[in-house]
Amino acid sequence: MAGFKILGFNHTSFTVSDLDRTIRFFVEACGFELLTRGPRDAGLLEKMTAIPGADVEIAFVQGPGHRLELIEYKGPADRAVIQSRLCDAGSAHIGLDVDDIEAAVRVAGDYGFRLAGEIITIDNGPNAGRRVAYTRDQDGVTVEYLQAASSGAQ
């Protein structure tokens, strides 16, 4: 044991280029609740992240059983949008259980999320019958939708 105890998950975070757009997706499309939104102390962020000129606005949204932190850096000026592939180390996503995967993908598309591949049905193993799809927005924020084998038409 490491000498400390993990008490639980606090949040998962995505850095985004447009906080308004990303909040709209999670609140309007996914039904999450906007908990807080606002700028953070740049000096503290510089110390915490070791990024000179760190200037951010942060929002927290709450979904069923989990909280997301959405961060938009306004500075430094040389920040970039990184488009990693799903197979690249460091790539991350969240997985959301849904009752209708086609509807979830369609609504996500209305907010700029596009299918990374196809909606598939797992045909063997412990998840046989489960339907799965990855969607990504222009920042590379990746949301996986999962529909249980017993939910809806297949």
Give a label for each model feature:
Residues 83, 91-96:
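Short secondary-structure subsegments characteristic of cysteine-rich extracellular domains
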Residues 15-65, 103, 110, 123-128, ...:
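Core segments of cupin and vicinal oxygen chelate
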